[in-house]
Structure formats: structure tokens, C-alpha cells
């Protein structure tokens, strides 16, 4: 009888340990498997010619979304590759590329309102957004807002490559007026 009691106690402890391990995995595993889009694995590039900053920024945004969705063809998303559906003398305000629909919207006025709106938009769009500054005129891929800093990839050849603080880019939040996103 003593052996059955011991076995039951040991079984309960083993099951409790197993359940605790599974609970811990459920909490930690999603973070471990999450894709870090802030690590450049080839998302970013410079515009191929003058006047195509919006097209290049849109291609980088689509590339990041395709990567995030696990599409092997994300590397094939290029400025020239999206041009036939996304370009009409400028970036189209609405287009679809490989089942990814891009739309256009305007930002509120005032730097504080723009900042608040962009933080919220980026939280919903980890692939980033195409941010356009009509005062320049120029566009960048706004990628994230981390530790109080906006980051972007500026397709202009006069700015460092890759993900850089928006303050190092050729546009500003204050001058931004509109954006495109998925």
C-alpha cells in the first residue's frame, strides 16, 4: 500500500513539473520565435534613381511584410518589381502587390499629434510605413519607435544605409504630412 501512495505522490510531482514547464514555454517561446525586424537581413536599399524615394520605401515596406509573413520570395520584392503596380508618375495612393494592399492616409497637424499617431500606427504595422514629407519632398520607410526614438531607412544616397534614427534622415516628423501602409 505504501508503494502505491509513493507512486501517486511522485506522479503528481512529475505532472506538476511538466505543467509548470509547459506554462513557462507558453510564455517564453513566442518571444524567442519572434522575428526581429530591427536586425537588417537585407531589407533596405537605396533608390535606383532620383525621384523614386516613395517607390523604394514602399518596396522596403513590402519586403519586410513578406519576410514577417515567412515568404521565401521577400528578397525578390524590389523597386523595379513593384513599379508596374505601384507607380503612376509617383507612388500610387492605393495598390496591391502579391496580395498585400497598400493604402494612403494623411497625418494630423502638429508635431505632438503626428508623433502620437505615428507611434500608434507603427504598433499596428511592424513592417513599417512609408512616411512622406511634402516640404522636402522626400519619403522614407519609418520602421519603428524604440525607447523614444523613431527609426527609418532613408533611400536617399546622401544618408547612411540601413536602419538609422529619423533624426539622421533627410525628413522630420514636423514636416511629414502623409503616409502609406499595408
Regions found by a protein language model. Name each.
Residues 47-56, 112:
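Soluble non-cytosolic domains of exported or imported proteins
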Residues 28-37:
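Sec-dependent signal peptide cleavage junction
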Residues 36-44, 59-182:
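Conserved active-site-adjacent core of cysteine acyl-enzyme catalytic domains
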Residues 10, 55, 180-182:
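Residue-level detector of bioactive/disordered segments in secreted/extracellular proteins
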Residues 17-27:
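Bacterial N-terminal signal peptides
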Amino acid at each position: 500500500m505504501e508503494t502505491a501512495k509513493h507512486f501517486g505522490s511522485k506522479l503528481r510531482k512529475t505532472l506538476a513539473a511538466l505543467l509548470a514547464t509547459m506554462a513557462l514555454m507558453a510564455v517564453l517561446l513566442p518571444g524567442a520565435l519572434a522575428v526581429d525586424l530591427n536586425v537588417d537581413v537585407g531589407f533596405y536599399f537605396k533608390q535606383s534613381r532620383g525621384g523614386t524615394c516613395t517607390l523604394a520605401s514602399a518596396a522596403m515596406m513590402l519586403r519586410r511584410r513578406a519576410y514577417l509573413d515567412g515568404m521565401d520570395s521577400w528578397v525578390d520584392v524590389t523597386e523595379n518589381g513593384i513599379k508596374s503596380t505601384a507607380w503612376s508618375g509617383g507612388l500610387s495612393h492605393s495598390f496591391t502587390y502579391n496580395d498585400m494592399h497598400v493604402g494612403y492616409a494623411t497625418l494630423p497637424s502638429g508635431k505632438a499629434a503626428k508623433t502620437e499617431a505615428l507611434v500608434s500606427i507603427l504598433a499596428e504595422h511592424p513592417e513599417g510605413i512609408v512616411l512622406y514629407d511634402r516640404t522636402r519632398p522626400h519619403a522614407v520607410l519609418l520602421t519603428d519607435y524604440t525607447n523614444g526614438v523613431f527609426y527609418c531607412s532613408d533611400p536617399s544616397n546622401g544618408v547612411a544605409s540601413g536602419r538609422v534614427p529619423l533624426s539622421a534622415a533627410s525628413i522630420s516628423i514636423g514636416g511629414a504630412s502623409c503616409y502609406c501602409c499595408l
